[in-house]
């Protein structure tokens, strides 16, 4: 996976067997993270060249899947919409609606009748990472610095949460500063 537009994506495969993420006793190498991200990218694109800033939400606890999803959605040209696993069905409905989401990725244990009803009413499809189709990863990823990368919802202390869009360039700058 490579792109000329966001310098932090290529480092996933360049670091090889170095540890990328640690979760308690478990660790994930950059190679393993790159493989997981590639599965997300290929599955979401499913033969298309780009998600064209499609908003793709996910409802996963902090985990390796969460990391692969946030990177994979952006790498595929989409806008990642991470949602809180502690949000109520009503709060999730608001966020999904405001963000204009059409696909929600979540593990089976996060599904509920209330969330199923919300997704059905909004026309949002639900699937898990393992349900993404196996497909080829494109050689070049469709990224440009000015395109949307991430929608983060505010806390909503004075009203309903608002979605704040971050660009590929702003996310890249943040990640680069963390790496340095």
Regions found by a protein language model. Give the residues of each.
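Flexible, low-complexity linker/hinge segments
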Residues: 1, 128-148, 175
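AMP-dependent adenylate-forming
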Residues: 7-29
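Conserved pre-ATP/AMP-binding loop-to-beta segment of ANL
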Residues: 17, 136-153, 160, 165
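Conserved AMP-binding/adenylate-forming
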Residues: 26, 41-90
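Conserved structural elements of the adenylate-forming
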Residues: 34-42, 164-180
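Residue-level detector of anion-binding/catalytic polar loops
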Residues: 79, 102, 125
């Amino acid at each position: 996976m490579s792109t000329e537009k966001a310098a932090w994506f290529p480092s996933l495969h360049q670091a090889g067997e170095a540890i990328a993420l640690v979760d308690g006793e478990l660790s994930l190498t950059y190679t393993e993270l790159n493989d997981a991200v590639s599965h997300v990218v290929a599955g979401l694109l499913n033969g298309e060249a780009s998600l064209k800033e499609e908003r793709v939400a996910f409802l996963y606890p902090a985990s390796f899947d969460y990391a692969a999803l946030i990177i994979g959605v952006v790498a595929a040209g989409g806008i990642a919409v991470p949602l809180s696993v502690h949000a109520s069905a009503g709060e999730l409905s608001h966020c999904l609606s405001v963000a204009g989401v059409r696909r929600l990725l979540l593990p089976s244990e996060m599904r509920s009748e209330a969330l199923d009803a919300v997704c059905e009413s909004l026309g949002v499809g639900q699937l898990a990472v393992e349900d993404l189709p196996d497909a080829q990863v494109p050689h070049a990823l469709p990224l440009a610095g000015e395109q949307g990368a991430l929608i983060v919802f505010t806390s909503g202390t004075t009203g309903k949460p608002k979605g704040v869009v971050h660009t590929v360039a702003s996310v890249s700058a943040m990640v680069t500063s963390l790496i340095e």
